[in-house]
Amino acid sequence: MVEKNERGKVILQTFDPYHWVIKKVIEYDFKSLYKQELADRKHFNYPPFYKLIKLVLLHKKSGYLFTGAHHLAHQLKKQLGDRVLGPEFTIIPRINTYYQQQILLKLENKLSMTKVKEFVQSTIDIWKKEDYSKSIRVKIDVDPI
């Protein structure tokens, strides 16, 4: 690691060496990089302009998971509409014996996160009473990295 005011060598490994981010880093143009990243985040409704809640659903049978995830997303969309994205399989769709799907909620900062969290939890609690979802595990991640 190179510390401030120290000379050093930094190696960047990338699939696309002509990507605008790599160019800005090579040019030491961090101010421009920051401005562009912030503009992109605003345009695509990401933090710090929006809050994110990620729900990861897990089950040993992909069919149960698929059905349950779609039912939960449908229930969430009734209240939250287009703020609900998914469900879709995670980048790694299966870990050990569990299949994974995720639902992402993109929420305006002006919304009461307390009320949203209460709504999400009550929706999950009602959904968990159905036969198709009783054995599906749900992990909730507020402001995922």
Regions found by a protein language model. Name each.
Residues 2-145:
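Accessory helical-bundle/CTD segments and flexible terminal tails appended to RecA-like ATPase motors
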